[in-house]
């Protein structure tokens, strides 16, 4: 059984222990402002992995909307829904589960 999870907001993939210890390196401030735990905003169900070494220079990072995030492994699709408290803080939020068609 995999202990990896993906953030439902930015898509970064880390172990459950990493999310539990330090939270999401890209989104933790938003989760704290919303008053929700990191585990509520991560999912063990995700598809595809993309390694980002230089997100600011990557067209794939721009396509995944992670070009402003830290280098790391990112999921292409993350199943699940963010808590409404988080979504309310993000006027331009696009779900990473593929439910919103552009």
Swiss-Prot record:
Transmembrane segments: none annotated. Its main location: nucleus. Pfam families: Spt4. It is found in: Nucleus; Chromosome, Centromere. One of its GO terms (molecular function) is RNA polymerase II complex binding. A zinc finger (C4-type) spans 7-27. Gene3D superfamilies: 3.30.40.210. CDD domains: Spt4. GO terms for biological process: 7-methylguanosine mRNA capping; heterochromatin formation; intracellular mRNA localization; negative regulation of autophagy; negative regulation of transcription elongation by RNA polymerase I; positive regulation of transcription elongation by RNA polymerase I; positive regulation of transcription elongation by RNA polymerase II; regulation of rRNA processing. One of its GO terms (cellular component) is kinetochore. Keywords: Centromere, Chromosome, Metal-binding, mRNA processing, Nucleus, Transcription, Zinc, Zinc-finger. Component of the SPT4-SPT5 complex. Interacts with RNA polymerase II. The SPT4-SPT5 complex mediates both activation and inhibition of transcription elongation, and plays a role in pre-mRNA processing. This complex seems to be important for the stability of the RNA polymerase II elongation machinery on the chromatin template but not for the inherent ability of this machinery to translocate down the gene. Belongs to the SPT4 family. This is Transcription elongation factor SPT4. The lineage of its organism: Eukaryota, Fungi, Dikarya, Ascomycota, Saccharomycotina.
